[in-house]
Curated annotation (Swiss-Prot):
Keywords: Disulfide bond, Hormone, Secreted, Signal
UniProt signal peptide: 1-20
Disulfide-bond pairs as recorded: 32-90, 56-105, 65-131, 69-133, 87-136
Tissue: Coexpressed with CCAP in most CCAP-specific neurons. Coexpressed with Burs in 4 bilateral neurons in thoracic and abdominal neuromeres of the ventral nervous system.
Species per Swiss-Prot/TrEMBL record: Drosophila melanogaster
Annotated gene: Pburs
Record flagged with keyword Disulfide bond: yes
The name this protein goes by in its record: Partner of bursicon
Length: 141
């Protein structure tokens, strides 16, 4: 491509890109938020020889990130594909450890365990307490 052609393409594309950028920044329709979600957790416990000792499960409420983030694709004379992509994803910005008690425990034969030491199991997991929009694929935070 000659210099004159590049200047012509740039003269046409740059104003369109700026309009697209202004439009995407001005919409304000991001709504990334922390929501409650019910999930079914199952945890198996094994002895040192790898034999299953018990299985515990429960339906629990945990936090999740959900929502929309502004993303855009705009023409570009610089990138090899001809488009510059800026994608943003709704993800956790802060995690907190939570202890959950699984209250339905069974032996390998499927018999319900009711003793205080075997009838329930505490597990730890990390759940989001805050969510916000981050550049997609950016795991450095």
């Amino acid at each position: 491509m000659h210099v004159q052609e590049l200047l012509f393409v740039a003269a046409i594309l740059v104003p369109q890109c700026l309009r697209a950028l202004r439009y995407s920044q001005g919409t304000g329709d991001e709504n990334c938020e922390t929501l409650k979600s019910e999930i079914h957790l199952i945890k198996e416990e094994f002895d040192e020889l790898g034999r299953m000792q018990r299985t515990c499960n429960a339906d629990v409420i945990v936090n999740k990130c959900e929502g929309l983030c502004n993303s855009q694709v705009q023409p570009s004379v610089i990138t090899p594909t001809g488009f510059l992509k800026e994608c943003y994803c709704c993800r956790e910005s802060f995690l907190k450890e939570k202890v959950i008690t699984l209250t339905h425990c069974y032996d390998p034969d499927g018999t319900r365990l009711t003793s205080p030491e075997m009838g329930s199991m505490d597990i730890r997991l990390r759940e989001p307490t805050e969510c916000k929009c981050f550049k997609c694929g950016d795991f450095t935070r």
